[in-house]
Design a protein with these regions (language model features):
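Active-site-proximal flexible loops/turns
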Residues: 9, 57, 458
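N-terminal, post-signal peptide beta-strand-biased segments of exported outer-membrane/organellar beta-barrel
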Residues: 15-135, 453
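Outer-membrane beta-barrel porins/channels
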Residues: 20-37, 41-42, 109-110, 117-493
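Sec-dependent N-terminal signal peptides
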Residues: 4-13
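Intrinsically disordered, low-complexity segments enriched in glycine/proline and serine/threonine
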Residues: 5-6, 36, 65, 277
């Protein structure tokens, strides 16, 4: 039954592999991508960045349609000394080094903005991908699966072969299996936001709004260990182990938003606060099975069917027996049918200052604080952060003439990461981001924006003793790259 425990523990780890992350996006409009510090803007992108600032925006209707194409790598590199060492067989093991390449991408990401202003009043709305946002795939699996399965398969086969006439070859034969593993997942939070803005006095405005958020995610993966040609005659042609998972999670949440803007002469000072958004997703578990080679041959356990027939609580209780999963059974909960898993979006505080040096030269600085430690994640992962996310932004914009504008900006992000927070398929790295781009005023009504930005991440190094239930120490490096290009059209009626 130890093998069953091990495989169920792997299944549970899938639950947290994508269970969290720092969930909020801020780049919806191309003006952000090319300048970053947009918290004091009064243009159409203020629908998100500074709703109160629309009190000084364009009189009448304006629309904006934006498209972005991001691409990113999320890589995990590991080193293990004396891997699969077996002193009893005279094998000291070997140094194992591998880089697991995770390709993260999203299709063309659109965002639509609209606003209408009349005198002191403005009403505005936007639709976009407001959180998470992307797809990641590890074609060769991830070390949290591959390392312990490799170690376990070797140990199990060695013990089994050691009691046969092939005992002298047990060390070599126990390595004769083929591991096939892959992991992929998706997380999108779609949002629709509405704001109401009022200029209270000539230099001060306020806005209230709310955003409806729809979370749509899935987690799919498999880990299959097949016997090699040398040992298939001993164990048959069925898998030594086969784990399959397909789980979809969906849920809703609503975000109240308040903002204020002080605007006098060349200065703009703005603040915005978004309240924490509770998103409680419900599982649609489509596949959750485990196939194992046992004393009586190969058999498959349909964990999903067990839960649907007997209820999730009964399944957890049964799996908690000492000869089954024991204390690990509780970690299965996040994947069982109809269970609920939290993916809260944190509260967000924004303060920004903008200054107009000349009618054609503007600059801004901005501060963000995401209270991630109080936004619940699956497995209470938020408690493992040392603090919420801090961001410092700055940008400058210059009108070359009436037709063309150029801008650039930067952003530094500090997530408050710890070793316990980082996971193979859901990890973060502190970063510096740089963006640039421009705008072309095609005529009095139409403006074309274009941008490019990249994020330069700091590698995160982590040492794990007795990693994944094995006797090995794993040195792990998390690394990321990120690039985004964008284009958008602003239209004033």
């Amino acid at each position: 039954m130890r093998k069953v425990l091990f495989v169920f523990a792997l299944c549970a780890s899938i639950a947290t592999a994508h269970a969290g992350g720092l969930m909020t996006n801020t780049n919806y409009h191309i003006a952000f991508d090319r300048m970053f510090a947009r918290g004091a803007t009064t243009e159409i992108d203020a629908v998100f960045s500074n709703p109160a600032g629309l009190a000084w925006g364009h009189e009448g209707w304006q629309l904006s349609l934006n498209f972005q194409k991001p691409w990113q790598n999320r890589d995990v590199e590991i080193d293990i000394n004396n891997f699969l060492a077996n002193p009893a067989a005279g094998n000291p093991g070997a140094t194992f080094h591998k880089k697991y390449n995770g390709e993260a991408s999203a299709p063309i990401v659109p965002a639509l903005f609209a606003s209408y202003k009349k005198d002191r009043w403005a009403v505005s709305a936007m639709i976009g991908i407001v959180g998470s946002g992307g797809f990641v795939e590890y074609d060769e699996g991830v070390p949290m699966f591959n390392v312990p399965i490799t170690a376990k398969m070797y140990s199990t086969l060695y013990q089994k072969i050691a009691g046969t006439p092939y005992a002298a070859q047990a060390d070599a034969l126990a390595r004769d299996f083929i591991l096939d593993s892959s992991m992929k997942g998706k997380q999108y939070i779609y949002g629709g936001q509405v704001n109401f803005t009022y200029r209270i006095i000539d230099c001060l405005s306020a806005a209230v709004g709310f955003r409806a958020n729809y979370y749509d995610g899935y987690y799919k993966g498999h880990v299959t260990a097949m016997p090699g040609q040398k040992i298939s005659s001993m164990v048959g042609n069925n898998p030594l182990m086969d784990l399959q998972l397909d789980c979809v999670q969906r849920g809703w949440g609503f975000t109240p938003i308040i903002s204020a803007d002080f605007h006098m002469n060349k200065w703009t000072v703005a603040m915005r606060y978004e309240f924490r958004t509770k998103i409680n997703t419900e599982n649609d578990t489509r596949v959750l099975t485990i196939g194992l080679q046992g004393a009586s041959g190969y058999s498959v356990t349909d964990v999903k069917a067990m839960a649907e027939q007997n209820g999730n609580a009964a399944v957890i209780a049964a799996l908690s027996a000492p000869d089954k999963l024991g204390d690990m059974a509780g970690k299965m909960t996040d994947y069982l049918p109809n269970e609920r898993v939290r993916y809260d979006m944190p509260s967000l505080f924004v303060a920004a200052v903008g200054y107009e040096f000349t009618p054609g030269l503007r600059a801004a600085t901005e501060f963000h604080f995401f209270d991630d430690k109080n936004a619940k994640m699956g497995g209470q992962r938020q408690e493992k952060l040392s603090h919420g996310t801090y961001e410092i932004l700055a940008g400058v914009e210059w009108d070359i003439n009436e037709k063309f504008t150029v801008s650039c900006g930067g952003q530094h992000t500090d997530y408050g990461l710890t070793d316990d927070y980082q996971q193979n398929t859901s990890f973060a790295c502190d970063s510096w981001s740089l963006g640039l781009g421009g705008a072309w005023n095609i005529n009095e009504k139409i403006r074309l924006n274009a941008s490019y930005f990249c994020s330069l991440y700091s590698d995160y190094n982590k040492k794990i003793n007795n990693a994944y239930g094995t006797p090995y120490t794993v040195d792990k490096t998390y690394s990321r790259t990120n690039n985004v290009i964008g284009i958008g059209i602003d239209y004033r009626f």
